[in-house]
């Protein structure tokens, strides 16, 4: 997948509405996502807004080998990106219904899956036992929004895709093109 910019529309959804809304759209979630969603620090979108998201690989970010989450987060900030807020994964999943199908159909294998788009949001909880971030994946024809656990030592492969915010709602100019 090439570097891609996506305009995302965010709208109010209560925490308890999110699972049913995703289900209605044909999106599957894992148990880690349910745990992630239930955390008290997970903030829902309160008002309708838009943001621009850029999807980039580690290579697009200038890495020449695998990198850890702290290295990726630091580079993202240096490049002018913002870490995506926790709820952005829901809206990005709804916007990217045409994601490439993963070549590896095995779920939960303890590594970053091919074709996944990861969102390194600020951690809701520092404990390794709690999911750290979410990612979007398409397996067979099923769309997934999954949460994952990993520590600061986990190295993401060079081909891993990440989504970062480039403009938030307050900076967005109506009618401009991404």
Regions found by a protein language model. Name each.
Residues 1-178:
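A binding-site-centric feature that preferentially detects glycan-recognition modules on secreted/surface proteins
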């Amino acid at each position: 997948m090439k570097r891609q910019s996506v305009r995302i529309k965010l709208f109010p959804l209560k925490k308890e509405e999110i699972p049913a809304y995703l289900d209605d759209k044909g999106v599957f979630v894992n148990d880690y996502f349910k745990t992630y969603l239930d955390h008290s620090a997970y903030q829902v979108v309160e008002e309708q807004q838009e943001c621009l998201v850029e999807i980039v690989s580690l290579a697009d970010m200038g890495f020449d080998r695998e990198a850890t989450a702290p290295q990726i987060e630091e580079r993202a900030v240096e490049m002018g990106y913002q870490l995506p807020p926790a709820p952005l994964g829901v809206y990005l999943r709804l916007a990217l219904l045409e994601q490439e199908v993963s070549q590896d159909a095995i779920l939960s294998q303890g590594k970053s899956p091919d074709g996944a788009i990861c969102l390194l949001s600020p951690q809701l909880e520092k404990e390794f036992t709690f999911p750290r971030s979410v990612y979007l994946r398409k397996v067979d024809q099923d769309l997934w929004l999954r949460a994952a656990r990993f520590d600061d030592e986990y190295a993401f492969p060079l081909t891993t895709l990440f989504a970062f915010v480039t403009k938030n709602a307050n900076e967005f100019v109506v009618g401009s093109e991404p």
